[in-house]
Amino acid sequence: MPNLTYKFITYKELIDGTYKDAYIPQDDKFPVTSHLTPSLRNAMIACPGNNDESKTFMKVCVDEENKEIGRAFCFGTRIKAGGRVYGAGTGFGFEVIEEYRKEGVGADLLLMTRNEFDFVLVAGISLKAFPLYRKLRYHLFEVQQFYKVRHARYVVKPRDLKGWLSLEKKTVKLKLKDIPNLIKYYELKRKVLIKKETIVPEWVTDMVANDGHQFMEVHDREWFQWNLDYNTYGFDEDIQSFYSVLDRNNKPLGFFMTKERLVQKSGPDKGLIRGTVVEWGACDKKALSESDINLLAMYSFSKRIDVIFTLACESDTASQLLRMGFKERASFKAGIKDKKKQLENIGDQQRWRLRYGMTNMIIL
């Protein structure tokens, strides 16, 4: 058994820069970058859930040479249960070098706590990590994800003349298949106004809080503004956008938020641009359905987008998305842990307002 040391790094250490003395990053050992970019540092300091500098920013496991072999970043959020709001911990960047995973480093990092929160909320759980969260007795949720190809290069990678001809043929097919969506889109646009916002409107707070679910992560105006203004890497291509949906008298009907990300990681998708519908809501789902919002969001993305991802959270959305040309993909996974078992029915997925844009998933 290797001699391992676990350390807590606080937000105060992040702010004053002394966190750099705690470990030696092993960037080349991880499938993604070290994460702690200047952009992410600024985002975490500005996070509306981080109001106590003494709380944990990062849990890290190091070897005898003080080199990082595992880590988990932490930050604060809030959950709403009925009429009450509770502080909750959450995190991201949970990674362990492969050869140490059998040593239980991953479980140790998740279990290691200073009892700063009674609840822990997680989202975007990977397929590999999902069994670990189940073993740690999290209440786990799965929501069906969907994707829609917008540019043929997402599925066709031309290397010769035949490949380029195939790309052009696929491009024409995609445009023809999209004609029914365009017709529905313009019909819907005659009824509503879509306004791109740089300052998130105040009415969003109540619209989200009163959507009818017993449990949810608190997504108020301040939280949305933070997600609009910051992201993890700070690349020029990384964009978040917020849109209000109004009736013809400028009365709020709903909203949606999107993000665009250039794939930087090596692999077949490198250089492609992904669009994601990360948040949405409506005051009257009969007047503006979840599938309506996805239709509006589809045409809000820049023309450079290669593929769009979204979730089907309402019961009838999945069939509508399939008609719009979306295809199913692996489920989106999230979870909650109620350490003191305070809240009844907290593990009932039907009582939760679930969105792709939970925890840090928008700024990522």
Place the predicted regions along the sequence by residue:
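Active-site beta-strand-loop-beta-strand hairpin of nuclease catalytic cores
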Residues: 87-88, 273
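Amide-forming acyltransferase catalytic core, primarily the GNAT-like/NAT-type
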Residues: 4-6, 11-64, 139-272, 277
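Acetyl-CoA-dependent GNAT
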Residues: 74-82, 258-264
